[in-house]
């Protein structure tokens, strides 16, 4: 009986873990959002445009399947794999 109960507990834990999804910040002032399936990387990039010197960089945050490539107009780029790590 104990073996059956232990087996059920293990199966339940494994099944719950398979359904886990990442949560990331979508904007600097937002609450965390659940990422779509397959997008388990949080990112945050600060990008400069023509108005960067007067108002600062444009911040973009969210969920991605792969980390974006760093570009010359990025001030910074962060990719991470833990919940809400892109603050």
Curated annotation (Swiss-Prot):
Q: Would I find Transmembrane helix among this entry's keywords?
A: no
What UniProt keywords are attached to this protein's entry?
Answer: Acetylcholine receptor inhibiting toxin, Disulfide bond, Ion channel impairing toxin, Neurotoxin, Postsynaptic neurotoxin, Secreted, Signal, Toxin
Domain of life, per the record? Eukaryota
Cysteines paired by S-S bonds: 24-42, 35-63, 48-52, 67-79, 80-85
Which tissues and organs express this gene's product? Expressed by the venom gland.
| Compartment(s) where it occurs, according to its Swiss-Prot or TrEMBL record | Secreted
Q: Which InterPro entries match?
A: Snake_3FTx, Snake_toxin-like_sf, Snake_toxin_con_site, Toxin_cobra-type
Q: Where are the transmembrane segments?
A: none
* Signal peptide per UniProt: 1-21
- Gene Ontology MF annotations: acetylcholine receptor inhibitor activity; ion channel regulator activity; toxin activity
Report the protein's function.
Postsynaptic neurotoxin that binds and inhibits neuronal nicotinic acetylcholine receptors (nAChR) with high affinity (IC(50)<100 nM). Is a selective, and slowly reversible antagonist of alpha-3/CHRNA3-containing and some alpha-4/CHRNA4-containing AChRs.
Q: What is the protein name given in its UniProt record?
A: Kappa-3-bungarotoxin
Q: Which organism is the protein's source?
A: Bungarus multicinctus (Many-banded krait)
């Amino acid at each position: 009986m104990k073996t059956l109960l232990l087996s059920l507990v293990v199966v339940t834990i494994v099944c719950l873990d398979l359904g886990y999804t990442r949560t990331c910040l979508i904007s600097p002032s937002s609450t965390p959002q659940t990422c779509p399936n397959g997008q388990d990387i949080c990112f945050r990039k600060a990008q400069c445009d023509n108005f960067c010197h007067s108002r600062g960089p444009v911040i973009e945050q969210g969920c991605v399947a792969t980390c974006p490539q760093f570009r010359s107009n990025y001030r910074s780029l962060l990719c991470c794999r833990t919940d809400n790590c892109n603050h």
